[in-house]
Amino acid sequence: MEVRKLSISWQFLIVLVLILQILSALDFDPYRVLGVSRTASQADIKKAYKKLAREWHPDKNKDPGAEDKFIQISKAYEILSNEEKRSNYDQYGDAGENQGYQKQQQQREYRFRHFHENFYFDESFFHFPFNSERRDSIDEKYLLHFSHYVNEVVPDSFKKPYLIKITSDWCFSCIHIEPVWKEVIQELEELGVGIGVVHAGYERRLAHHLGAHSTPSILGIINGKISFFHNAVVRENLRQFVESLLPGNLVEKVTNKNYVRFLSGWQQENKPHVLLFDQTPIVPLLYKLTAFAYKDYLSFGYVYVGLRGTEEMTRRYNINIYAPTLLVFKEHINRPADVIQARGMKKQIIDDFITRNKYLLAARLTSQKLFHELCPVKRSHRQRKYCVVLLTAETTKLSKPFEAFLSFALANTQDTVRFVHVYSNRQQEFADTLLPDSEAFQGKSAVSILERRNTAGRVVYKTLEDPWIGSESDKFILLGYLDQLRKDPALLSSEAVLPDLTDELAPVFLLRWFYSASDYISDCWDSIFHNNWREMMPLLSLIFSALFILFGTVIVQAFSDSNDERESSPPEKEEAQEKTGKTEPSFTKENSSKIPKKGFVEVTELTDVTYTSNLVRLRPGHMNVVLILSNSTKTSLLQKFALEVYTFTGSSCLHFSFLSLDKHREWLEYLLEFAQDAAPIPNQYDKHFMERDYTGYVLALNGHKKYFCLFKPQKTVEEEEAIGSCSDVDSSLYLGESRGKPSCGLGSRPIKGKLSKLSLWMERLLEGSLQRFYIPSWPELD
C-alpha cells in the first residue's frame, strides 16, 4: 500500500512539473523578454537586444540562470527581428515558420515547441561539454576576435604560421577531435606555431571572413594566406599540414660538395649563415620554423651527419655527431662566429642564439630598413648608438681596406658602436653627403662616425680626414676617435640630412610582377577549390556564363557560314536556272526592310589595299555595291549614292564602296566585257574609246561566287523602264555612254540625276531578279 502511495506521489510530481513547464512556455512573451512595447521599431528592438545580450552573456555573467536568460533573449530577438515571424506571433501567438495551418493547430505546435525548448537536461550528468562555459578552458586561452585577427594574427603570420580551429556549441565532431587538438597544439606551440580558436556562434564575421562554413574546421595561415586542412584529425597529419605551409626553400641541404659555396654567400646575400648538424635525415620542424621566422636576416643550412659526404665538415669544425650542434658563420668561413650544442634544443635557446647573431660583424647597408635596425635613433644620453661607416668601392673579392676594417671591428666590438660598410658606387648620394671633398676621395675608401638624431635622416658625423687604407696608423686614429667619443659626444661636429638608401637586394620589376601574379593565381586557385567555394559561386557562374555565350556565338556563326557554303550552287547550275527563267535569290526582301543601324552610310574606297578583303575574300552571302566616279563628280555622286542606298544599310550582307575611274579604268572595262552581248565591241583605237563616260555606274560584286550585276544611268523614259535590269543587254549596253558629243552627252542634266533610279535597282538586287555576269577570276587592281 505504501509503495502504491509513493508511486502516485511521483506521478503527481511529474505531472506538476510538466504543467509548470507548459505554463512557462505559454507565458513566453518576446516583447516582455526584451523589455520593448508591441509598437517598437526594429532599431529599438536591436538596441534592447544588444544591451541585454552583453549583460546576460554566459561568458561574462556568472549567474546560474544567465544561460537560460540569454537563450530567451536570443529567441525573442529571433522572433521580433523577423517581420514575418513577428506578425505571426502578434496574430496567433506562434513563433514558428509554418503559417499555412489554422490558428488552433499553430497554437498546439507553439505549446509543444516551447515546452521542448524550456525542458533542459543537465549536461554535467551525461558529461557532454556542449557549452563553451563548461568546456575545457584550453580553448578560451586561444579565442580570437575579428580585430585581434586582423591587427595581430595576420601581421604575425609573416613570422610564424598559425593553426586555427573553428568550433561552435552543440558540435559532436568538435568534441570528438578535442583530445587530439589539445595534444597537438601543446606540442606545436612549444615549437613556435601560433594557435587560435574561433567560435562560429559568437564570431560569425570572422568565421565568414576565413571561409569556414562548417564546424569543426581547421585552417592554417602563413604570410596572410589561408589554407584549409582536409585530412583526418590525427597528430601526424596536423604536423605535416603545418610543415606543408612553410616554403620549401627555407633550409638548404649542405654536404662536403657545397658547404664552401653556401658559407661564402655572406658577401652577396649580406647575411650570416647558420648550419645545424644532426643525426635525423629529415630537417626538424623546429629548425624550419626558426628559419621562417628569421628568413630576412640569416640563411639556414642543414647537415645530416649520418650521410656519406659530410665527414670533412664534421672534422674541420670539430662536430660531435651524437648531439645536435648549431653553428653560425659570418665573414669568416674557416671558423664559426658562435656555437651551441645540446641534446634537447628548446625554442628559447635557439631564439637567443639567433638574436645574438642576426647581423654580420660589418654588415653592408643595403636598404633603409637595415640602416634603421643597425643604426637606431638615440632615445636618451645613456642609449647612444654610434655607427662607424666604411665607404668603399664594390669589388668581387675582399679588398685590403675592408679586411683591415673587419679585423678592427672584430677587435673593438662594443654595445654602443656598430660597424657597417657601404658601396659608394651603389649608394652615391649617401656617400657624397658624408664626404666633405668627394674628389679627394675619388676611388678611395673613407671612414665616417655618425649618430642618428631623428627618423627624418638628420645625423651628426665626423669623417676621417685621410682616406682609409687599413694601415696601423689608420686603426690607431680611428681608435682614438672612438675613445674620445665616449668622453665628449661633441666630437661629431658636422651635421647633415642623409637621403634614403636604395634597396639593393629588391627584385627587379619583372620579378616582382611575376611573384605577384603567381601569388594571385595561387590565391584564386585555393579560393575556388578549397577556401571560399560558396563565395566564389557567383563569380564562377558569371565566368561560365560569359564563356558559354562566347563559344555559343562562335559555334552558331561557324554553322551559319557552313550552311551558306552548302546552300550555294555552282555557276553552271545557276546559268541553267536562268535559261529556264528561274533564279535563286541570294537575299530576301526582309533584308531591305531592316532599320538602318547607323545614321550614316559607310562608303570605303576600293583600292589595291582593300581589294582583297572587300572583294576577293568577301564572306559567302555578302556583296559589295561599288559606285564608279571620277575626281570631278566625286562629291555630288557620293551624296546622291548615300541617299539612295541609306535604307538598305540595315542589311549586314551589303557593303558599299566607290571606285575611282581615273585610276582604275582598265579594271572596270575588263569587267564590262563580260556584260556585253554579241554586238561589235568597240576598238580600243577608236577615237571615242578613251572618252567613254562610266561615272554613275554601280556594280554589285559577289566575291565568293565571282559574278556581278550592273546598274547604268538611263537617259530616256523608255530606257528608264529597264533600269537596273541586266537581262536586256541589247537595249542597255551603250545607254549612258557619252561619245563626247553635246547632243548625246550627259552634260545637259545634273550629275546627281544619274542615280535617281538606284533605289529601285537595289530592291531588285535584293529580290534576286537581276541578271548575273560571271567571270573566271577577279582581275588584279593595279
From Swiss-Prot:
Topology Extracellular: residue spans: 557-782
Q: Where is the signal peptide?
A: 1-25
- Annotated membrane-spanning segments are 536-556
* Residues carrying sugar: 631
| Chain positions covered by the region annotation Disordered | 562-593
Q: What is its main location?
A: endoplasmic reticulum
Q: What is this protein called?
A: DnaJ homolog subfamily C member 16
Q: Which organism is it from?
A: Homo sapiens (Human)
